[in-house]
Amino acid sequence: MPYTTAQICLNGHCISSAVDMYPEEAQPFCEKCGAKTITACPKCGAPIRGVYFEKNCGFIPELDKAPAYCLQCGSPFPWTQSALDVAVALIEEDDSLSGIERKQMIETLPDVISETPKTKLAVIRLKKVLSVVSSFTADGLRQFAIEFGCELVKKQLGL
């Protein structure tokens, strides 16, 4: 299946869905945030998958959102890792949670992003955490779920 190569900034803004086909769209830095842009996974060098393209169609749709993980090595892309790091920091800094609750929530954060067999557990833990943490932490975790959560998480949380 012929896919294009996408160009995305380190903060997850999509610059081009098909930078390999339209090199004139390439930008070394993001015009929205100023971050460096990439076209390949920093861990393994695989191209970032853009959109499916058929030569006879001639139409290149834009990416809905930046992919969370590399298809070749499974590593989180920089924007995903950054979001996970921020969510971890929010959880660690909130005194309302016990050490065990912090550890459990942090361990299930990847299951908020990707739908896995553990996603339902992640939703239950997230709901529990949202009910006891400060409003600042709750707002940050809700925003994390809105921007990076899989559809099941968004649906279960009513986002």
What are these regions (language model features)?
Residues 146-159:
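C-terminal, charged low-complexity interaction regions
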Residues 136-147:
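Transmembrane alpha-helical segments and their cytosolic interface motifs
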Residues 2-138, 156-159:
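Short amphipathic alpha-helical segments that predominantly mediate membrane engagement
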